[in-house]
């Protein structure tokens, strides 16, 4: 297995598909990487030479934010919003939907399981 950006990518798959196993690389970026390095998109990972794998690894290290760095950057952006006290930060803090979705009904994924209300008894 080829190891790129700390991830073992599958050897039997085509190169662009295998690169999407890395957090932060989707289909479009994977195809851009193949074009930039000069690797045919139809080739499989087990057909790549060590030099080609090294070229992919160097290109990703230089041009793409992936894995731990991307996760850290995302969490720091959310923390910054919470520290600012802006509306989006408050929604993150309270565990509610951030992007304007309704919360009267639905939003159970973000709010967690329904809580029982000690309400009126019949």
From Swiss-Prot:
Region named Disordered: 99-122
Give the CC-aspect GO terms.
cytosol; small ribosomal subunit
User: Which GO molecular function annotations are given, in alphabetical order?
Assistant: rRNA binding; structural constituent of ribosome; tRNA binding
Q: Which GO terms describe its biological process?
A: translation
**Keyword set for this entry?**
Ribonucleoprotein, Ribosomal protein, RNA-binding, rRNA-binding, tRNA-binding
Q: Which family does it belong to?
A: Belongs to the universal ribosomal protein uS13 family.
- Which purpose does this protein serve, as stated in its record? Located at the top of the head of the 30S subunit, it contacts several helices of the 16S rRNA. In the 70S ribosome it contacts the 23S rRNA (bridge B1a) and protein L5 of the 50S subunit (bridge B1b), connecting the 2 subunits; these bridges are implicated in subunit movement. Contacts the tRNAs in the A and P-sites.
Question: What is the annotated quaternary arrangement, including any partners?
Answer: Part of the 30S ribosomal subunit. Forms a loose heterodimer with protein S19. Forms two bridges to the 50S subunit in the 70S ribosome.
Question: HAMAP family annotated for this entry?
Answer: Ribosomal_uS13 (MF_01315)
Q: What is this protein called?
A: Small ribosomal subunit protein uS13
Gene name, per UniProt, is rpsM
